């Protein structure tokens, strides 16, 4: 990420740089803010969460046991059951195995049909993800962030990754406690994990646009929304990103 940031700064000198991360990408952005403080003009954290230390400890112990038994590089259906399966139970009776992704049925269907989405991750990946979550959860690490970098948390109120808002609030409060002076949070009622692919995504793009403009030095205030993106139904396949 830092290499990409340097490339963008060289190619677009003087242009403000904001870093957006969704889901696992939000955890990577949080790692970036710790390791490279003060190198972006703002950060947007979407679909994030904040797991409790006890859960992380149990998860790492389970991963270590499974890796000793099966190895680190073999895909594991257990990981999918423990994560995606648990997420989906909230929305039973389920139409698909990924109803938790979105309240927009067309978006869910595009996800299911995409061969790059879903599947069983390896236990090694699960272990590394838990290690990363532990890293970004430690207060002594959060204190390394630049307190002047604006951060906004955006999530759906029905996103199980953020524990339906509870995990998002914990992450938000942790940033405030670490001294981040411009931390904001917004939960969208009824929306699930992929808020930028929900039917109401134009409102979210507008909120994000306004937040960014207000944090660009010298930018003229505006009440205008950005150009409307294509409707989710028409663009679901072209805007699909692997989870």
Label for each model-derived stretch:
Residues 20-25, 29:
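Gly/Ala-rich beta-loop-alpha elbow adjacent to hydrolase catalytic centers
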Residues 29-116:
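Alpha/beta-hydrolase-fold enzymes
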Residues 153-155:
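Short beta-strand/loop motif that positions the catalytic acidic residue
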């Amino acid at each position: 990420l830092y290499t990409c940031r340097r490339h963008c700064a060289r190619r677009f000198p003087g242009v403000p740089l904001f870093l957006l991360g969704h889901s696992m990408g939000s955890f990577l952005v949080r790692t970036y803010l710790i390791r490279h403080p003060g190198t972006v003009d703002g950060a947007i954290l979407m679909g994030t969460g904040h797991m409790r230390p006890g859960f992380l400890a149990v998860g790492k112990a389970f991963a270590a046991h499974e890796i000793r038994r099966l190895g680190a590089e073999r895909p594991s259906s257990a990981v999918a059951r423990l994560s995606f399966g648990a997420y989906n139970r909230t929305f039973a009776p389920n139409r698909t195995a990924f109803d938790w992704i979105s309240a927009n049925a067309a978006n869910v269907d595009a996800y299911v049909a995409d061969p790059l989405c879903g599947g069983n991750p390896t236990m090694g990946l699960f272990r590394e993800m838990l290690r990363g979550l532990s890293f970004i959860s430690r207060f002594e690490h959060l204190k390394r962030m630049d307190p002047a970098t604006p951060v906004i948390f955006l999530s759906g109120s029905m996103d199980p990754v953020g524990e339906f808002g509870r995990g998002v609030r914990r992450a938000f409060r942790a940033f405030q406690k670490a001294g981040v002076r411009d931390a904001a949070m917004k939960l969208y009622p009824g929306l699930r994990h992929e808020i930028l692919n929900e039917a109401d995504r134009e409102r979210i793009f507008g909120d994000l646009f306004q937040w960014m403009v207000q944090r660009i030095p010298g930018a003229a205030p505006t009440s205008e929304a950005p150009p409307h993106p294509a409707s989710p139904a028409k663009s679901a396949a072209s805007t699909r990103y692997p989870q």
